[in-house]
Structure formats: structure tokens, C-alpha cells
């Protein structure tokens, strides 16, 4: 089961690398939908079946509508693929190579990454001793997001705040 989750998480990141180097809206939307589905699979394999189902229905359902309209508006007769442009293909391959090196480096025994120390998280237990569950994994994951994952939550909020200004700047009409 752990290998399946690992493969899904690697494909999850590969999908987002494909989205970030998208040459056409068709392939970018496809990459985002595949990555969203894999993320829901990771959540469901971790024990959060209800959360995975809700994210799958709401997030991917909304994305299908948005990307359906986007693709209909930006239909190209000959859409550009990842291999048709050398720069886009090289950006995709460099991102993929960086991910492979990161995974190899993390599994090599070196546990420190850019100031974040991953050791000591062995004591972070979501289940009780002997298989007796104190709290469901859905609830303990939400609690750990606000306690141990505070910096991740703050960074995600900051990125959403900055994305408002980016979207406003892109869509602003210049006369």
C-alpha cells in the first residue's frame, strides 16, 4: 500500500510539473484534473474517505466546468504539445529530473532539507498504541494542520493573497 501511495504522490507532482509547463490549455487542464484525482486518491488511501470524496466531487466537478468553457473559448486548430517546443519540453524534463534527484536525496539518509529537519516526527502519532484508534485520521489531520503544519498553512494563505493581486493585474484593462 505504501508503494501505491508513493507512486501516486510522484505522479501527483509530475502532473503539476506538466501543468506548469503547459503549451496549450487543453493539456494544462488535463494535467490539473489528473493531479487532482491523484490527490484525492492519496487522501482516500490515508483513511480520509469522506474528505477525498468531497474534494473529488467539488474540486474536480468545478474544474471540469471551468476547463470546459476555457477550452471551448481557446480552441486551437493545432494545439501545441509538450514535444513541439524545445523550451517547453526541456522545462518539463528539468522539473522531472529535479524531482527524481530530490526523491533520491531524501531517501539516501540525509534528513535535512533547506533548514527543515524531518527527524523527530516519529513521535507524531495519529493512531493509538496497539491499533486502538483514539481519534479518526480525518480529524487528527485537521488538528495537525493547525499545530505542526502552521507554517504550511501560513505559506498557503500568503500564496492565495498574492494570487489575488496577480489575477487582478493580469485581467486589468490598460488604456
From Swiss-Prot:
Report membrane topology. Answer: Multi-pass membrane protein
Q: List GO terms (cellular component aspect).
A: mitochondrial inner membrane
* Main EC class the enzyme belongs to: translocase
User: Keyword set for this entry?
Assistant: Electron transport, Membrane, Mitochondrion, Mitochondrion inner membrane, NAD, Respiratory chain, Translocase, Transmembrane, Transmembrane helix, Transport, Ubiquinone
Record's catalysed reaction(s): a ubiquinone + NADH + 5 H(+)(in) = a ubiquinol + NAD(+) + 4 H(+)(out)
One GO MF term:
NADH dehydrogenase (ubiquinone) activity
Pfam families, from UniProt?
A: Oxidored_q3 (PF00499)
Q: State where the protein is found.
A: Mitochondrion inner membrane
GO aspect biological process, one term: mitochondrial electron transport, NADH to ubiquinone
**Transmembrane regions listed in the UniProt entry:** 1-21, 24-44, 51-71, 87-107, 112-132, 148-168
> EC number(s) of the enzyme?
7.1.1.2
What do we know about how this protein assembles, alone or with others?
A: Core subunit of respiratory chain NADH dehydrogenase (Complex I) which is composed of 45 different subunits.
The family annotation for this protein states: Belongs to the complex I subunit 6 family.
- Known function: Core subunit of the mitochondrial membrane respiratory chain NADH dehydrogenase (Complex I) which catalyzes electron transfer from NADH through the respiratory chain, using ubiquinone as an electron acceptor. Essential for the catalytic activity and assembly of complex I.
**What is the protein's given name?**
NADH-ubiquinone oxidoreductase chain 6
Primary gene name? MT-ND6
